[in-house]
Amino acid sequence: MKRVFLIVLDSLGIGEEPDARLFGDRDCHTLKRIASAPEFRFESMRRLGMGNIDGQEYLPGEAKPLAAVGRLQECSMGKDTTIGHWELSGIVSPSPLPTYPNGFPKEILEEFQKRTGREVLCNLPYSGTEVIKAYGKEHMETGKLIVYTSADSVFQIAAHEEVVPLPVLYDYCRIARSILQGKHAVGRVIARPFTGAPGSFVRTAGRQDFSLEPPGKTLLDALKEEGKTVCAIGKISDIFAGRGITEKVATHSNAEGMEKTLETLDRNFEGLCFTNLVDFDMLYGHRQDVSGYARAFAEFDTWLPSFLKKMREEDLLVLTADHGCDPGDGHTDHTREYVPLLLFGKGVRPVNLGTRKGFATVAATVAEALGSSYRGQGKSLWKEIALPNKEEKALVKAAQRAMEHSYAPYSGVQVGAALLSSDGRIFTGCNIENAAYTPTVCAERTALFKAVSQGVRSFRMLAVCGGKNRVLSGVFPPCGVCRQVLREFCSPDLPVLLVQGESSDPAESSLEFERTTLGELFPRSFGSEFLSE
């Protein structure tokens, strides 16, 4: 794949996780909740296979879904935007970010007031719309800043744009960010500007997040280091504190986020387009607006076909979420839920992946699809979902042809191998048996020795097939000796295609194979590097 479009439907949870009660959640299910609303529309997502995901039996399934689908369980100890996105990018957080159910401690506020020159109001967990109703008038009269938090790890500053201009509010947020470190390192400091008069205050689009930097290397960092594009649409750049981003596209609504993502399809680039659609969470989940959430989902569902239609041959679309925010559970906080995973593209096999542990699965899968070695703390699904590409098809067919020349009068088992060199040449080999048994040479070594004898020392891929009576019959992995010989010239990352040959149609059997690597076949192996000085 050349381009991956990763779209986070912010807060679209699909059912409570087993540990939800530890996070204060019970009977939460964001998607099921909005599916009961008359505004809910589901046609495009149904065709992709959303109703086929584990736990979504209340939705109609699809006999032949277009996407590979599954359900992801979060491993991090949290249910907020920052930790959710960090895990999607490859980092699992074993400890939750600090929260302040009783407000921020005295030493934090005193330092903040000293450095800003302004006193503060509130200092309690509050709804963003309710806090300006309660304190907005006093703020306008006194100039005191409205500081509040929520169940998430956030330090929020609300201020009227006529009292505190946006640039000044952002400076205050930077001051707060510099103070909130160490044990008080909240996930985000958020600017919450508003306008209007008492009784009719309205929050504006000038929100800005000042996030804690990720504690380790992310998928975004890896792709940027490798020279690939990382285009951040919506609040992605804010969430990652600008790290690992090559392009930033600001948006103010789901509609604008979808529009900018669609425009990116027309560009030529290699890498990742990472979009967050925040309205689901900010406008509807937190505000307990089931109808609004359902309507926003319907708008996305209606938009989706225009995106799918414009996708190119080597594009991959990944749809997922970062946490839940059930709009009908009676409170305004995020919810600890599974999130959906849908992967669509012309190179994707539409399989049901079941339930997988770890949002970091997304980072590992995207990385492998883009040819990056990064895996983070996730396990890639790419080998399970990728359809054979032209290079793989050619290599498997070459191995199959080599199998026809096998000399195996004693075992009756014919094996063929094809080794792809770094310069694009294919070297084939078959097993050659001997009456004395020990001089027998396997197909893999035959192919490798042929290549090495012609001066080739660098390889990109290996394919192996086998069977009896020259009929493919199951997987034939390399023997131990072959694995050691291959290790002499090949890295543990060498892709290995093990032909399964389960199809009764010989023309199709060559396309049925299992992807693995030399390292997976030969873990903790001994190589020449251990003998070098």
Where are these regions (language model features)?
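Short, compositionally biased leader-like segments
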Residues: 387-397, 500-506
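Short beta-strand scaffold segments in enzyme catalytic cores
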Residues: 341-343, 412-421, 497
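Short, flexible loop/turn motifs enriched in small residues
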Residues: 334-337, 410-414
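Zn2+-dependent cytidine deaminase-like catalytic core
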Residues: 428-530
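RNase H-like nuclease fold core
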Residues: 415-434
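Feature captures the catalytic ectodomains and active-site-proximal regions of enzymes
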Residues: 1-387
